[in-house]
């Protein structure tokens, strides 16, 4: 009879495959941050109903599904116009990814930068390392740790002092 693997083992296997693919295009500090976050998750696993903060949340389906990486983006040319006029900025995400071409970011105030986190890491690696490298989720936040380990990108917002 085959041994049933626990959820943490499944995520660790999936992480190893992604880490191998990322090693050539991510800085070492980010790979280490991801590994540290996975270690936090691995030490605690998915919370269950015995965990006070999660007693009303059943994560059994997540434990059976495992992690499925987001598919590459398909190109989209436009988004529906807002019902009311927008006098301001618009940040568009499609399938969890920042879409600068569809966002309205013209005439940002001086000193304000909005871009994808991946672009910022490439453009300002030392700054991002200093801001991110010590941000490991605590053991009481296993889903935050799992998110940190597997995240693909994000939004970078910098407002100069």
Q: Predicted segment positions?
A:
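Glycine-rich and polybasic anion-binding loops at the starts of cofactor/ligand-binding domains
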Residues: 1-161
């Amino acid at each position: 009879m085959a041994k049933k693997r626990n959820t943490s083992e499944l995520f660790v296997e999936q992480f190893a495959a992604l880490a191998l693919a990322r090693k050539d295009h991510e800085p070492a500090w980010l790979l280490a941050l991801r590994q540290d976050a996975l270690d936090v998750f691995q030490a605690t696993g998915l919370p269950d109903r015995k965990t006070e903060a999660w007693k009303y949340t059943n994560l059994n389906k997540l434990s059976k599904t495992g992690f499925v990486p987001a598919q590459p983006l398909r190109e989209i040319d436009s988004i529906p116009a807002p019902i009311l006029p927008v006098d301001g900025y618009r940040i568009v995400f499609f399938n969890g990814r920042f879409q600068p071409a569809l966002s309205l970011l013209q005439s940002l105030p001086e000193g304000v930068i909005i871009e994808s986190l991946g672009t910022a890491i490439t453009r300002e690696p030392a700054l991002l390392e200093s801001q991110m490298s010590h941000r490991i989720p605590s053991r009481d936040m296993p889903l935050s740790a799992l998110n940190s380990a597997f995240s693909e990108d994000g939004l970078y917002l910098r407002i100069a002092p």
